[in-house]
Amino acid sequence: MPIIRNSAKALLFHQGKLLLNSHLDRSGAPYYDLPGGGQEPFETMEEALIREVREETGLTVRPLRFLALAEEIFTNPQMRQRYPQYCHRVMHIFLAELVPGVPQTQAEPDFQQTGSVWVTPEEAGALPLVPIQLRGQIAQVLASSSPVYLGAVRRDEVCM
């Protein structure tokens, strides 16, 4: 049975740069996403954000405010059958900051994750970024006085 997967993602800036996780897709092409991931039962979105960022990057963050929501729906029947838990994702995007004085721990990268990189906002605008709806919209999302619904995208490929 298909599942709607909630995830918490961080827009994490440090010294003017944004942290992104780098990945390779099934074809070997690079793409980037915000650190963060799936919410566990009985876990708040903020708790999920802190846990997932620490797992993927080894960094300890503090959520500052909820910025945006984006949905990703995979329509490919093969994808839906093999990975029902990833076929409809609702990404809750938070502005976050590093917690000062906490040393970085060993990261436990996700499947297909090749590392983490700090990039300028301009560099991020030129990268294949997930969620797709955030491409070219980071400044507008940060400038908004209230959370932004970035919409839903339907994707036909098998991504895992």
Where are these regions (language model features)?
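Conserved N-terminal beta-strand and adjoining loop/helix that marks the start
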Residues: 1-19, 40-41
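Unchanged
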Residues: 39-62, 73-130
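Conserved beta-strand segments that form the floor/walls of ligand-binding pockets within enzyme
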Residues: 19, 33, 93-95
